[in-house]
Amino acid sequence: MLDKSKKERKRNEIEPLINERIKYSQIRLIDTSGSQLGIYSSSEALTIALNAGLDLVLISEKSNPPVCRIIDYGKYKFAQEKKAKEAKKKQHNVTIKEVKMRYKIDVHDYNVRINQAFRFLQGGDKVKANVIFRGREIQHTKLAIELLNKMAQDLSHISEIQQPPAKDGKNMIMILSPKKI
């Protein structure tokens, strides 16, 4: 079976065609400074690139004729990888942090939960406030809603309600997200 491995196929999909791999008869050629040299046959363009000691790289195959550029492929590949790393570094994954409590919570414990939620929101994460019921406590959903609304009010300067208090099985949950500045 002559099937290529997944890794090889993926590598070939990502890497642009260079030098002899370019099979088009006519191509639009761009030099190292970015100016257009005109339309050449693939073999002429390859000769020009090799005489300059550089590579012929297919930039866009969707245009008619396809666009190729004379560049040092090693430097080009390094620059592309560096751009991808920078883009990955700048993106921030938002996670949901959970703060659990009971509807009968003491003042000090409540303040600890508020401080936890405050730190999570400052870090750019969403907060899932979870009021847990046990046994017959499920009858006191109004008290849990009041507690969650109080929490939302106490954190209103840094957060906004993404999901209002709602019953979720034996729990009452509310999701807060950081305010967009």
Curated annotation (Swiss-Prot):
Entry's transmembrane regions: none
GO biological process: ribosome disassembly
Intrachain S-S bonds: none
Location within or outside the cell: Plastid, Chloroplast
Any one GO CC term of the record: cytosol
Superkingdom of origin: Eukaryota
Gene3D superfamilies the UniProt entry points to: Translation initiation factor 3 (IF-3), C-terminal domain, Translation initiation factor 3 (IF-3), N-terminal domain
InterPro entries cross-referenced by the UniProt entry: T_IF-3_C_sf, T_IF-3_N_sf, Translation_initiation_fac3_CS, Translation_initiation_fac_3, Translation_initiation_fac_3_C, Translation_initiation_fac_3_N
PROSITE patterns attached to this UniProt entry: IF3 (PS00938)
GO molecular function, one term: translation initiation factor activity
Keyword annotations of the record: Chloroplast, Initiation factor, Plastid, Protein biosynthesis
Subunit and partners: Monomer.
NCBIfam families: infC
Family, as annotated: Belongs to the IF-3 family.
Its job: IF-3 binds to the 30S ribosomal subunit and shifts the equilibrium between 70S ribosomes and their 50S and 30S subunits in favor of the free subunits, thus enhancing the availability of 30S subunits on which protein synthesis initiation begins.
Annotated protein name in UniProt: Translation initiation factor IF-3, chloroplastic
Organism annotation: Gracilaria tenuistipitata var. liui (Red alga)
